[in-house]
Every structure is written in structure tokens, then in C-alpha cells.
Swiss-Prot record:
Subunit structure: Homodimer.
GO biological process, one term: NAD biosynthetic process
Superkingdom of the organism of origin: Bacteria
Gene name per UniProt: nadE
GO cellular component, one term: cytoplasm
Organism (species): Rhizobium rhizogenes (strain K84 / ATCC BAA-868)
Pathway connected to this protein: Cofactor biosynthesis; NAD(+) biosynthesis; NAD(+) from deamido-NAD(+) (ammonia route): step 1/1
General function of this protein: Catalyzes the ATP-dependent amidation of deamido-NAD to form NAD. Uses ammonia as a nitrogen source.
Reaction catalysed by this enzyme: deamido-NAD(+) + NH4(+) + ATP = AMP + diphosphate + NAD(+) + H(+)
Chain sites annotated for binding ATP: G48, L49, S50, G51, G52, V53, D54, S55, T204, K233, T255
Family matches, as InterPro entries: NAD/GMP_synthase, NAD_synthase, NH(3)-dep_NAD(+)_synth, Rossmann-like_a/b/a_fold
Designated name of the protein: NH(3)-dependent NAD(+) synthetase
Residues that, per the record, bind Mg(2+): D54, E209
EC number of this enzyme: 6.3.1.5
Amino acid sequence: MNPSPLSIHSALSSDALRIDAAAEVDRIAQAMRDQVRNKMRRRGLVIGLSGGVDSSVCAALAAYALGAQNVFAIFMPENDSDPESLSLGQEVAKAFSLEGAIEDIGSALAAMGCYERRDDFIRQVEPAYGSGWSCKVVISSPLAGEGYALSTLVLQAPDGSQTRHRMPASVYLGIVAATNMKQRTRKQMEYYHADRLNYAVLGTPNRLEYDQGFFVKNGDGAADLKPIAHLYKSQVYQIAEYLGVPEEVRRRPPTTDTWSLTQTQEEFYFALPYDRMDLCLHALNEGLGVEETAKATQLTTDQVERVWLDIHSKRKATRPLHLAPLLVQPVF
């Protein structure tokens, strides 16, 4: 019997999530063809390319499954975007011969008040915040043993000095609500192109993001299919190498590219770098022991238990993001 492309090693180690990339690519491509052509009866796929490894792998899979001529890539910079995101996204499109378009959403976001609303909330904790300033939100690590993650607002003044601010809940929620306009506006643009082409929209979350609710509802969480949601981030990198995703993309640290200050996903949401988070999540899912997990991740047993608690907490807190609209009674 041939092993499953997602079969794993029995012992937890850095190799625990190794996969047969070729077999897994074929399996995903077959599923994508069936979903797009038979289940949804669409001609192709639209994808927002961010210059990150997840969207790049999904674009490569789409081209492999349906042909590059049936994939449309969209690049959607805004006022806070890192210019590298656009250049890397375009490099990916070129590597896989994808047609695409640049849709700068900065003016649309400004017209809706995205930036001004965010800045108004920031000024509740730092009245001087304005032109020339930059910001990001970071969380405390659950490894610190505080029991829950605290969000901190980091501000950089025009002279380069940085300050950290605790936020009232209303300020935090207001900043996040304004910032979430970015993901929702991008998704609106993706569906515009999907509608005009009779294409489906391709979602790009990996398993860690999907499991932990690291997405905006009706924003980057909205899609018609999500072909890598079962793959750990470590496995996405294996697929990226196999499919020939440009090395510059594979070397780039995972980033939200949402805030005007550079911010990693680890700073904003996850407790650890993705490779160790993957192992902790896999160990929890498979019911492996805390001692084995600690050895594989180079954490203490107390730290592993804190990471697992954080995983459970995020699953509970973000469960509503996964729910379809609730009905009083079934309709279909």
C-alpha cells in the first residue's frame, strides 16, 4: 500500500510534518479541478497575490490544476503596504505566467475613512499621533505565563522614537475594526473580477491560520475554495519549493503587511515562529505527550502547556468566524 502524501513520522521532530509534495500537489489539483468545474461550474480562479508564501503557493496550485490562462491574479496595495509585497507578487505572477491587474485600494479606503477612523482611536491614547507617525499592534507571548495575551499599541514618532501603550478595549476594537476594512475591500475587488470573468475566488489560509482564526470574517476569510487549509505552514513551504515559488518569497518572514510599522505574524497573533507552532498544534491534534512536544520544540513542559492553552483559547474565541449565518430553522 502506498503511503498517504500527508503521512507523518511516528516520532515528533523537525521532520514530523514532511510530506510527499508531488503526490500532495496532484491530490490538491484534482480536488480543485472538480470543485471549480463540476461543483461550482466556473471557468477559472481569481487570487489576490500578496507576495507571501501562502498566496504564492495557491497561485501556483491554481495554474497547475487549471492552466495559467484560467487564473487571474490581483495585486492590491494600499497606503500602508510594503512595496516589496507588490514586487514579489508580480514576480510570482511572472514565474507562473499569470495574467493580472494592480488595484490600488488606498483611495477607496481613505474615502471610507479607514485611516482617519484608525488614527482617531489612536489619538485617544497618543494625542500627538498624525502625519509622519507609524503604528502596529503586538501581543504579549503566552510563554510569559500571564494567562492571557495582552495587546499593546506600538507607535513610532517622526524622529524614529518608539513608545508602547496599553489600550482600553474600546480603542483596541476601534483600531482593529478600521484596519479590517483593508481585508474586506480586497475581497470585494476579488469578487468583482470573479463575477466579470465567471471565475471562483481562491482563499489562501494554511492550517495554522484556519485553525486559530487568523483571518477577517467576510475579508480574507471569504472564498469559494481553500485548497491549503489542511496543510501546516511547514508543509506549505515544502509545496512552495516543489512548485518553484521564487526563493525571495520563500525567504520572506511571514508578515501581516497591514500596519505602517513592519510586523510579523508572530508579533501580532501567534505565540511562536510557525515551525514550532506547527509542531505544537500537530502534537495537540494527535494527542502526543507534553514531554515529547517540549523536546521537539525546545520548550519547557510548562511553555508547551501554555501554548496549548493559547491554542484552545483562540479556537474558542474565533469559532464565530467559521460559522455560516445562523437561521431560526433549516431552509434547504
